[in-house]
Curated annotation (Swiss-Prot):
<dbReference type="InterPro" id="IPR032416">
    <property type="entry name" value="Peptidase_M24_C"/>
</dbReference>
<dbReference type="InterPro" id="IPR036005">
    <property type="entry name" value="Creatinase/aminopeptidase-like"/>
</dbReference>
<dbReference type="GO" id="GO:0046872">
    <property type="term" value="F:metal ion binding"/>
</dbReference>
<dbReference type="InterPro" id="IPR050422">
    <property type="entry name" value="X-Pro_aminopeptidase_P"/>
</dbReference>
<feature type="binding site">
    <location>
        <position position="562"/>
    </location>
    <ligand>
        <name>Mn(2+) 1</name>
    </ligand>
</feature>
<comment type="similarity">
    <text>Belongs to the peptidase M24B family.</text>
</comment>
<dbReference type="Pfam" id="PF01321">
    <property type="entry name" value="Creatinase_N"/>
</dbReference>
<dbReference type="InterPro" id="IPR029149">
    <property type="entry name" value="Creatin/AminoP/Spt16_N"/>
</dbReference>
<keyword id="KW-0645">Protease</keyword>
<dbReference type="GO" id="GO:0006508">
    <property type="term" value="P:proteolysis"/>
</dbReference>
<comment type="function">
    <text>Catalyzes the removal of a penultimate prolyl residue from the N-termini of peptides.</text>
</comment>
<protein>
    <recommendedName>
        <fullName>Probable Xaa-Pro aminopeptidase P</fullName>
        <ecNumber>3.4.11.9</ecNumber>
    </recommendedName>
</protein>
<feature type="binding site">
    <location>
        <position position="576"/>
    </location>
    <ligand>
        <name>Mn(2+) 2</name>
    </ligand>
</feature>
<keyword id="KW-0482">Metalloprotease</keyword>
<feature type="binding site">
    <location>
        <position position="453"/>
    </location>
    <ligand>
        <name>Mn(2+) 2</name>
    </ligand>
</feature>
<keyword id="KW-0031">Aminopeptidase</keyword>
<dbReference type="Pfam" id="PF00557">
    <property type="entry name" value="Peptidase_M24"/>
</dbReference>
Length: 657
């Protein structure tokens, strides 16, 4: 029998230091077949009337003596992209972007998000909401706005399963200074309002990720983790982040759109391996893959087991109980279940660090899948230009996105998309994470900028590519902006730097040419990319986030290189390649340390009619010509029977004039 993820009507409240009794997430009684194509979930760029939802939420807040309630974007595993049943912030606010935090008081409501979503949030939020543009001068953070609303000894509530323990502690300290208090609400209030309309929690089958793609047996990965535990003198590692579990066990799932992960937890000790996952997800083949050393336990039992695990922790030489280690992304609920900071060390995950450094098999897979993906993109752009210019066809943004997915699906090892395709024309290209919806999206204008940011999941890797084209005559400003963005992409692509350098330190390289003109973009320059895993992968990245300064780049890291420029209501430009860090030879070896550079793997032409060649240096012109020669060499063989695409590729990869 099918049933909805519906919370009980009685709500429990707990203070920061109190133990929690967590209810298991509801589960459907069936399993769906693992799919090999992706359903693309579109986003309405229209406002949703949230008055009734907010009224119901405030009534529940009143019943539970709450003055303020926080609704984060994340799920119980701190996933950036979530299953539809976990889209609570979207439900209560109407804002559909992937990042943001909603805060509701008895008299006001605010949503905080970053620069990728300023335009989208402004369009989607109704008059009940105040938009907090994160990072802008004079704009309160959501934590500051919460503290302001809670002044005078008020009570702030949050579901402890969807906020990290570190965030909860920091917010609690801030609130206590003003005489206020943070409490954890065991049953999510938004779930109460959503009720029977809340989507079912996915229960997809798990698949083995073969060694031919993984490159390393999962037993060796666990052995490496145990060495880390021995070095740190910890009793075990509690794994709560979904892509870390998928990577660690060489498994892939289908529980979250575009991300091949599955709902689970794991506990690794020097002697045991426990995987907390619904048994119905595991086929006999997967159980054989895991072997007898991996003990399968029910997904929801992690919280019940937590107390017992911490109670029987081995002793240190001094006789004190040894702590467990967990990621700094672990939820407040999980932390409290293990006994909090006294029993649990929260740190950057060693699994995350290891996963970010791809082995040679994974790197080869990333190279190979980007060649196939580049061929798919080339076929798409050739088709699109022919339809718009020669056939005078009328195509909307969704038509384009659907055609691109159709082309990709023909290629070897294709599984699905890695995120919603951003197919955007004219002013829509200025909406950084724009997602078109059939019926309300725009017709692609051949006389305007067209920006396409898209990616796919292949068995041997994950892709993410952005290209900006103009199929007619671009304006002088469009060409200038495009060329400045291109110069930034080249600057990062060709960077050479000593080992130990972080992505934080490299960010200015991609922005420098825009900065000289007084221009900039409100998003990071690059993010880590998984190997047939999440398209956004930590802990590395290129940008101004503080966490990017805490992790240096290493050979084997795979990141995006994607500077951009956007003029609201006019156009947007972004160029994105995927690049891999590697050791490079230099004339000298200052400090006797390795020096690193990048290898680009994206193989798709860069729109030449948008390049103002007079703004390029001799070296930059040579880079463009060399890049296009490489694209031709690696992808032209796909089009021996496709004259239209081959001719378009030849045109777009000619040396600059």
């Amino acid at each position: 029998m099918l049933f909805s993820c519906r919370a009980p009507s009685l709500l429990q409240r707990t203070a920061l230091s109190s133990p929690l009794r967590l209810f298991a997430p509801c589960r459907p009684s069936f399993s769906r077949t693992f799919v090999t194509t992706t359903v693309r979930f579109s986003v309405e760029m229209e406002t949703v009337n949230t008055s009734e939802r907010l009224a119901q939420l405030r009534e529940l807040m009143k019943q539970n003596n709450l003055d303020v309630y926080i609704v984060p974007s994340e799920d119980s595993h701190q996933s950036e992209y979530i299953a539809h049943c976990d889209a609570r912030r979207e439900f209560i606010s109407g804002f559909t972007g992937s990042a943001g935090t909603a805060v509701i008081s008895t008299t006001a409501a605010a949503l905080s998000t970053d620069g990728r979503y300023f335009n989208q949030a402004a369009k989607q939020l109704d008059s009940n909401w105040k938009l907090l543009k994160r990072g802008l001068e004079g704009v309160l953070t959501w934590q500051e706005w919460t503290a302001e609303q809670a002044e005078g000894g008020k009570i702030v509530g949050v579901d402890p399963s969807v906020i990290t323990a570190a965030s909860a502690r920091k917010l609690s300290e801030t609130l206590e200074k003003g005489g206020s208090k943070l409490v954890g609400i065991e049953q999510n209030l938004v779930d109460q309002i959503w009720g029977t309309h809340r989507p079912q929690r996915p229960s997809e089958k798990v698949k083995i990720h073969p060694i031919e793609y993984a490159g390393k047996p999962f037993q060796e990965k666990i052995a490496d983790l145990r060495k880390e535990l021995k070095t740190k003198k910890r009793a075990g590692f509690i794994v709560s982040v979904l892509d870390e579990i998928a990577w660690l066990f060489n498994l892939r799932g289908n529980d979250i759109p575009y991300n091949p992960v599955f709902f689970s937890y794991a506990v690794i000790t020097p002697d045991t391996v426990d995987l907390y996952i619904d048994d119905e997800k595991l086929s006999p083949e997967v159980k054989v893959h895991l072997g007898s050393d991996v003990v399968i336990k029910p997904y929801e039992s992690i919280f019940a087991d937590a107390k017992a695990l911490s109670a029987k922790a081995p002793l240190t030489e001094s006789g004190a109980p040894m702590k467990y280690l967990t990621s700094n992304k672990a939820s407040w609920a999980l932390s409290l279940s293990f006994g909090g900071e006294k029993k649990l060390d929260e740190a950057r995950s060693p699994i995350s660090d290891a996963k970010a450094i791809k082995n040679e098999v994974e790197l080869k897979g990333m190279r190979d899948c980007h060649i196939r993906d580049g061929a798919a993109l080339t076929e798409y752009f050739a088709w699109l230009e022919n339809e718009l210019i020669n056939k005078k066809s009328t195509l909307d943004e969704v038509d384009g996105a659907d055609k691109l997915e159709q082309i990709r699906s023909k290629h070897d090892k294709f599984v699905g998309l890695s995120f919603d395709t951003i197919s955007s024309t004219g002013p829509n290209a200025a909406v950084i994470h724009y997602k078109p919806e059939k019926g309300v999206c725009s017709v692609i204008d051949p006389n305007a900028i067209y920006l396409c940011d898209s990616g796919a999941q292949y068995l041997d890797g994950t892709t993410d590519t952005t290209r900006t084209f103009h199929f007619s005559t671009p304006t002088e400003m469009e060409k200038k902006a495009f060329t400045l963005v291109l110069k930034g992409l080249i600057a990062l692509d060709t960077a050479v730097f000593p080992k130990g350098t972080s992505g934080f330190a490299l960010d200015a390289l991609a922005r420098q040419h825009l900065w000289r003109q007084g221009l900039d973009y409100l998003h990071g320059t690059g993010h880590g990319v998984g190997a047939y895993l999440n398209v956004h992968e930590g802990p590395i990245g290129v940008g101004t986030r503080i966490q990017y300064s805490e992790v240096s780049l290493s050979p084997g890291n795979v990141i995006s290189d994607e500077p951009g420029y956007y003029e609201d209501g006019k156009f947007g430009i972004r160029i994105e390649n995927i690049i891999m860090a590697r050791e490079v030879e230099t004339p000298y070896k200052f400090g006797d340390k390795p020096w690193l550079g990048f290898e680009h793997v994206t193989m798709t032409p860069i729109g030449q009619n948008l390049i103002e060649t007079s703004l390029l240096s001799k070296e930059e012109r040579q880079w463009v010509d060399n890049y296009h020669a490489e694209v031709w060499e690696k992808t032209s063989g796909f089009f021996k029977q496709d004259e239209l695409t081959l001719n378009w590729l030849k045109k777009e990869t000619q040396p600059l004039k």
